[in-house]
C-alpha cells in the first residue's frame, strides 16, 4: 500500500491515495449490492420532505439512533468518591464500551472491572463470578470501596446483588467491614441518567442506612452545611471546580457529593494515580446532617433527591442553569438556604457576562437553533438561547417525558423568542433529521454524534454536550456560573463568526463582507 516506514502518512491523507480509493470502490462493487445512484438519490430527497416527516413521526415500534446510552454507563459516572472501584456484574464487552466512552470524552483513563460473565453464568447464575471478581478487585487494585452494578445479562436472570455481596463477605473474599454499595442498573430500561441516579442513591443509602445491615443506621443531626450534586455532567471537571469557587466566594460550608473533578483529570507528573480525589467517606456520611441538598440536574437525580428529602433535608432541584437568569436563581437559592450574601466579586462577574452578551447580541438575535441532549441540559441551553435573543426552534430529547415537555413549553412561553419553538420528548435523531430538513435552522447544538446531522443536513453544529469525542479538552471548561455562561457564549459566537467567514470567501462576489473586525 501507499504507507511506508520512511514517511508515515496520517489516515486522513492516506485514504485519499489512489490504491485506497480503488480498494474502496472494489469493496462497494463486490460486497454492498448497491442500488443505482439515481435511485438512491431519489430516496434521499424524499426523506427530506414533509410527507416523509409525517410518516417518520408516526413510528411506534422502532427507534432510529436514539440519543441515549444505557444505565450501566451512567452508573460508571457516579464514581466521584475516594478510592472507589466501579464493578459491573456482567460481561467484559460491556465494560470495554463504558471505559472507552469515557476515555474518549475526558481523554483520561477510566478504570472499571467486570465479573466476566459468559454463557455459563448467564444460564446458571453469576454468583461465582461475583465472589471471584470481588476478591480479585480487592486484592489487585486495593480500592477503598467497590461500587457494584449490573448489566442486562445479570438482570435477565435475576441475580441478587445484595445476597451475592453478603455471600462474598461470608466466604472471606472481601472483609466484612469493607464498603460495597450496589445498585441494580438494567440496560433495557431507562438510560444513562437513570443509571447515574440509581448508583448515587445506592451509595448514599449504603452510608446512611447501615451499610446493608452490617452497622446501625446513621441518625440525622442537622447542621448548616449544604450538599451539592452535579448530576450526570460531561463538564464535571470544569463545573465542579467552578462550583467550589462560587461556594468559597460566598463563604458557604458545603459538601460535593460525587466529586469527579480530580477523578477525570489526573496530572501527568510522573506519578500514576489509580484513584484521585473524590468525596471522602466521612464527608458522605456527614452529608446526612446537611441543612439542604442542591442539585444542578434535578431530572437526572429524581430518585436520589427524593431519598434525600425523605431524610428530612430541604432539596433544591435545578435544571442545568446556564446564563444570567439560571446563575441568578442558583446563587439566590444558595444564599437563601445559607443566609450568606452573594459576594461583590460574583456581582462583578454577573456584570461582565451581561456586558459580553450586550457586545455580541447583534450576531445572536433571531438566530434559529436545534438542540439535542439530556433533559436538564436541554432546559439550560434553551433558556440561555432565549436570554440571548435566539430561538431554540427544535429541542429533541430522547429521555424527555411529558413533565419535561411541560417545563420546556413553560420556558418557551416566558419569552417572546419562544414563539414557534417546540419540544420533542421521546424522539430520536432520525426525527430530528426530518425537523431540520422541513423547518431549517441556522445551527445545531449537541454532542459529537450531532456531526452526522451536520453532514447530512448541511447545518453547522456547535459542540456542547456529552460525549464530545472529536474535540479536545472541552470538559475542562465550566458551563455553570457566570464564567461558564461566557464560555458557552464564546463557543456559540465562534461558530457563528466561522460561518460568516466561510460564506464570504468569494473574491469579488461575497468578500465585501469578509471583515477583519466582527
UniProtKB/Swiss-Prot annotation:
Per the record, the GO terms for biological process are: nitrogen fixation
Q: What is its EC number?
A: 1.18.6.1
Spans traversing the lipid bilayer: none
Which amino acids does the record list as binding [8Fe-7S] cluster? Answer: 70, 94, 152, 187
A single Gene Ontology MF term assigned here is: iron-sulfur cluster binding
Task: Output the Pfam families linked to this UniProt entry.
Answer: DUF3364, Oxidored_nitro
Q: Which cofactor does it need?
A: [8Fe-7S] cluster
Extract the CDD domains matched here.
Nitrogenase_MoFe_beta (cd01974)
UniProt entry keywords in alphabetical sequence = ATP-binding, Iron, Iron-sulfur, Metal-binding, Nitrogen fixation, Nucleotide-binding, Oxidoreductase
Q: Which residues form a coiled coil?
A: none
Q: How is the cofactor bound?
A: Binds 1 [8Fe-7S] cluster per heterodimer.
Cellular compartments per GO CC: molybdenum-iron nitrogenase complex
Q: Which reaction does it catalyse?
A: N2 + 8 reduced [2Fe-2S]-[ferredoxin] + 16 ATP + 16 H2O = H2 + 8 oxidized [2Fe-2S]-[ferredoxin] + 2 NH4(+) + 16 ADP + 16 phosphate + 6 H(+)
Looking up InterPro entries in the UniProt record yields:
ChlB/BchB/BchZ, Nase/OxRdtase_comp1, Nase_comp1_CS, Nase_Mo-Fe_CF_bsu, Nase_Mo-Fe_CF_bsu_N
The record's function comment reads: This molybdenum-iron protein is part of the nitrogenase complex that catalyzes the key enzymatic reactions in nitrogen fixation.
Subunit structure as annotated in this protein's UniProt entry: Tetramer of two alpha and two beta chains. Forms complex with the iron protein (nitrogenase component 2).
So what family is this one in? Belongs to the NifD/NifK/NifE/NifN family.
Protein name as annotated: Nitrogenase molybdenum-iron protein beta chain
What is the organism of origin for this protein? Acidithiobacillus ferridurans
Give the gene name. Answer: nifK
